[in-house]
Amino acid sequence: MGYYYRWEDFPPREISYLKGRPEASKLLVRIMSSARMMVTQINAKKGAFVPLHHHEAEQIILVLKGQIRGTTGKEAPQMIGPGGIWVVPSNMPHRVEYVEDTEAIEVVSPPRMDNFVGYTLSHTFFDE
């Protein structure tokens, strides 16, 4: 049996794992998850960023509008614009800076439960 939704079915919200950080209000997401993957619609204001972090999930980000600066591991930062795709392997430290107002789609597998409840143990997510 298939399931059909619209993004409007999922209310925009701040990212739970950024709760309490000043950059949280510049990032709004809509999240849809199945048992094995999660898709997130990202709307970010210029200047928003997600600090260096890592997680079990593999991550793919497709930029639809705007520009991001993505850093993977110790590699040089890369500018990613409309149509650009960034693939982040599992447990690889990475960070993202939103250089312009940006719209993007993110796919992760397995789903990241921290997007829903936030991490409760210290040093399990942020690396800076």
Question: For each of these PLM feature ranges, what is it?
Answer:
Residues L64-K65, G81-P82, E100:
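A cytosolic small-molecule/anion-sensing beta-strand core signal
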Residues K46, E56-A57, A76, M92, ...:
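A generic "binding-loop/recognition-motif" signal
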Residues M38-H54:
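Conserved short histidine dyad/triad with adjacent acidic residue
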